[in-house]
Design a protein with these regions (language model features):
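Membrane-interfacial helix-loop segments of redox and metal-homeostasis proteins
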Residues: 1-217
């Protein structure tokens, strides 16, 4: 690809990402879509509404992703998550630290960006610290600690670490077909679970589930 065409494509991708992020932020702000808020509502009040929003969004994203993979528009095997080594300790420690930071920072990364757009100065400070910490964990001093500790613990799997890899290996069908089948079962199940509750059937809840899931696609 010539440099001129590559530059033009880069600009298109950046503008598309900007527009999608604007839509994502607007929907999040309008519907109060929030991962930490969903968990907090369930634990504190027994209210599953925002958790159902989250479940529907995941279901829509799963189905859309599998359709793109089945059609050949994307290659899931090239994702950084499609590895043959399962870093289970890294996932546990990282998940715990993410959850802890989400509570202390009053929201995850996406919610922090939405709050910055609303003029929240605390969110701006959280965003700066989060950016520095993330970069350090990828390529800085904490990356050395990460590689020397949690990433030394893992399990090598011949068929890959994703459910699609396992299903394809067990059934003998192509990975794209296995992925499509799994997404329809799991993703469709999540959408059904979310929408079966009568109290959930409100336009804003559907906007959150379908809109956020669509933005992810």
């Amino acid at each position: 690809m010539q440099s001129t065409a590559l530059s033009a494509l880069t600009v298109q991708v950046l503008w598309a990402g900007f527009l999608v992020s604007m839509v994502f932020g607007a929907i999040t702000q309008r519907t109060r879509f929030c991962t930490m808020g969903a968990i907090s509502d369930v634990v504190s009040y027994g209210d599953w509404t925002r958790m159902r929003q989250w479940g529907m969004a995941v279901g829509v994203a799963m189905i859309g992703f599998s359709i793109l993979a089945y059609g050949g528009w994307i290659n899931p095997a090239k994702s950084i998550y499609a590895s043959t080594r399962w870093l289970w300790l890294s996932a546990l420690v990282g998940g715990f630290l993410f959850g802890l930071g989400m509570v202390l920072g009053s929201g995850c990364g996406s919610k922090t960006l939405v709050r910055i757009g609303s003029g929240n100065l605390k969110a701006f400070v959280v965003f700066l610290v989060m950016g520095v910490a993330a970069f350090a964990t990828l390529k800085g001093i904490t990356a050395v600690v990460r590689v020397a500790t949690v990433e030394r613990v893992g399990i090598e799997l011949s068929q890959g670490t994703t459910l699609t890899d396992w299903a394809a290996s067990a059934s003998g069908v192509p990975a794209t077909v296995a992925g499509m089948a799994l997404s329809m079962v799991i993703g469709g199940g999540l959408i059904f679970w979310a929408s079966r509750e009568r109290s959930f059937r409100h336009p804003e809840n559907y906007l959150a589930g379908l809109g956020i899931g669509g933005a992810v696609i």
